[in-house]
């Protein structure tokens, strides 16, 4: 996922939602039958860079996730929301994003 390329038109992704705060796209390398990335429009390197003032952004991001889970038909069975932080946390892109995954059962703890 190339979050930095979204605004340039160079990222090959299916956009599912756009508003002034959040963009949601289908992951180009899905790890579940439904795998969507929710990305803040404003550049935030990771969750470590969030502040109290980002509350409205996070509220919007989670509301969009819930709306997409319903529209994708995965809300009732359940889904997973994941934000990877740092190298050991699995973060591979230097832009905060949340994975919405569903359509199959997940194990705990994750790999």
Language-model region placement:
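HIT superfamily nucleotide-processing domains
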Residues: 1-111
């Amino acid at each position: 996922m190339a979050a930095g390329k979204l605004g340039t038109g160079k990222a090959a992704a299916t956009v599912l939602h756009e508003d002034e705060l959040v963009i949601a796209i289908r992951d180009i390398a899905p790890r579940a039958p439904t795998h969507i990335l929710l990305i803040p429009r404003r550049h935030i390197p990771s969750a470590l860079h969030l502040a109290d003032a980002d509350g409205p952004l996070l509220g919007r991001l989670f509301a969009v996730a819930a709306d997409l889970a319903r529209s994708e038909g995965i809300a009732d069975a359940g889904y997973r929301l994941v934000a990877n932080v740092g190298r050991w946390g699995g973060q591979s892109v230097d832009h905060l994003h949340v994975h919405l995954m569903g359509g199959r059962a997940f194990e705990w703890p994750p790999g």
